[in-house]
């Protein structure tokens, strides 16, 4: 293998801002920010908006849209095109 072409693999501290959860994971991600972890060591620090701790699929808090709602929304958007030839009485 050629020297000096591979990225540096190290432990990185990820912070999910939505769930306020920290993950210590091996990564090659580059960052200038550092933060001290609960074990006393200082690690590179990266913030996340969504992770497995806050994503609806993993938390089980999914929002389902009913079929009736989708049909009603379609009617609101495109109903005017289907009612052109009909009398409004």
UniProtKB/Swiss-Prot annotation:
GO cellular component, one term: ribonucleoprotein complex
SUPFAM superfamilies documented for this protein: L28p-like
Pfam families documented for this protein: Ribosomal_L31
Keyword tRNA-binding in record: no
UniProt keyword list: Ribonucleoprotein, Ribosomal protein
UniProt keyword Transcription present: no
Superkingdom of origin organism: Bacteria
Assembly and binders: Part of the 50S ribosomal subunit.
Name under which the protein is recorded: Large ribosomal subunit protein bL31B
